[in-house]
A protein has these predicted regions:
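Outer-membrane beta-barrel transmembrane domain signature
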Residues: 23-53, 64-65, 79, 94, ...
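Short, acidic/polar
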Residues: 55-58
Length: 202
């Protein structure tokens, strides 16, 4: 199962169509001075840009800057309405997920996205999120989360406010590997998405 997730992520990154960088493993906080790497295949069902939806992928590297903050660098590719994209995310987990309480955090994200009409789009978003992990059978742990990314998108000298709702979960299969499943739905001038992926942490 894990090999299938990894192969799907690699193939979609090499031969991708339209996609949008999602929440993915932001709530799965990386410890101080540790790191994680993940592949995020994604289907985009609709966009407010010309070109419609498609299928693509993002690769993301996360590093634990402090005991309460992470830095993530992402790069992706696609066809349809969106092509190459690159950006970064700074996340602050101000209430850790511990026994008896949910985890709360916020992430600030900036991405440059090359569109297939030869123009470009720049996004600046905030990602408030809440998550809570719990054990299931055979030592596996689910870490479901809800996030509401919102912010500004700049394109061709204009800007607009955007907002999306996101529901997803990480599945901890062992100490190092996480599987990810996520759906996002348009609230205001954004995309509806479905993604799955895999990440590895040291």
């Amino acid at each position: 199962m894990i090999k299938a997730f990894f192969l799907l992520g690699l193939l979609s990154f090499l031969g991708a169509s339209s996609s949008q960088a999602g929440v993915f493993n932001i709530p799965e906080f990386v410890d101080y001075q540790s790191w994680a790497f993940g592949l995020e295949p994604e289907i985009t069902f609709d966009t407010f840009e010309k070109g419609g939806g498609g299928f693509g992928s993002n690769a993301k590297f996360t590093y634990g800057l402090t005991p309460l903050s992470n830095l993530q660098i992402g790069i992706g590719t696609g066809a349809g309405s969106r092509g190459f994209r690159v950006g970064g995310t700074y996340s602050f987990d101000f209430i850790p997920d511990m026994e008896g309480q949910v985890g709360l955090g916020v992430a600030a994200q900036g991405y440059y996205i090359k569109l297939h009409d030869a123009s470009a789009r720049t996004e600046g978003l905030l990602y408030p999120y809440v998550h809570k992990s719990f054990g299931i059978r055979n030592g596996m742990i689910l870490d479901p989360y809800v996030a509401v990314p919102f912010g500004m998108a700049f394109h061709s000298g204009t800007y607009r406010t955007v907002m999306q709702g996101v529901i997803g979960t990480a599945i901890r299969t062992n100490e190092h590997v996480r599987l990810h499943l996520e759906t996002g739905f348009n609230i205001k001038d954004y995309d509806s998405t479905l993604s799955l992926g895999i990440s590895y942490r040291d």
